[in-house]
Amino acid sequence: MISVGHYLAVSAVLFTLGVLGIFINRKNIIVILMAIELILLAVNINLVAFSAALGDLVGQVFSMFVLTVAAGEAAIGLAILVIYFRGRGTIAVDDANRMKG
């Protein structure tokens, strides 16, 4: 049987990959968005694992809320990237740092 420790190990690996993805690849905004999604997935796995282990549904409901927020964040982030790419022709983070505003 799979215990909570197994879920925590998978979640820790996903969280670490997400954090490393942000720190290692700072040039591509799409990769940074995918790394943030990995971090949110790791958080969701933790919420569901502890919720199932404790027999409480609050963690699972909150996990659905986090999934909804993550989907909205991804959609808005990609829409902003498409508009930025059409205007500038690149999605490099270095060029985004020079934005006016």
From Swiss-Prot:
Belongs to the complex I subunit 4L family. One of its GO terms (cellular component) is NADH dehydrogenase complex. Disulfide bonds: none annotated. GO terms for biological process: ATP synthesis coupled electron transport. Keywords: Cell inner membrane, Cell membrane, Membrane, NAD, Quinone, Translocase, Transmembrane, Transmembrane helix, Transport, Ubiquinone. The gene is nuoK. Gene3D superfamilies: 1.10.287.3510. The chain crosses the membrane at residues 4-24, 29-49, 65-85. This is NADH-quinone oxidoreductase subunit K. Its main location: membrane. NCBIfam families: PRK05715.1-2 (NF004320), PRK05715.1-3 (NF004321), PRK05715.1-5 (NF004323). InterPro entries: NADH_UbQ_OxRdtase_chain4L/K, NUOK/Mnh_C1-like. It catalyses: a quinone + NADH + 5 H(+)(in) = a quinol + NAD(+) + 4 H(+)(out). It is a multi-pass membrane protein. NDH-1 is composed of 14 different subunits. Subunits NuoA, H, J, K, L, M, N constitute the membrane sector of the complex. NDH-1 shuttles electrons from NADH, via FMN and iron-sulfur (Fe-S) centers, to quinones in the respiratory chain. The immediate electron acceptor for the enzyme in this species is believed to be ubiquinone. Couples the redox reaction to proton translocation (for every two electrons transferred, four hydrogen ions are translocated across the cytoplasmic membrane), and thus conserves the redox energy in a proton gradient. The keyword Repeat does not apply. GO terms for molecular function: NADH:ubiquinone reductase (non-electrogenic) activity; quinone binding. It is found in: Cell inner membrane. Its EC number is 7.1.1.-.
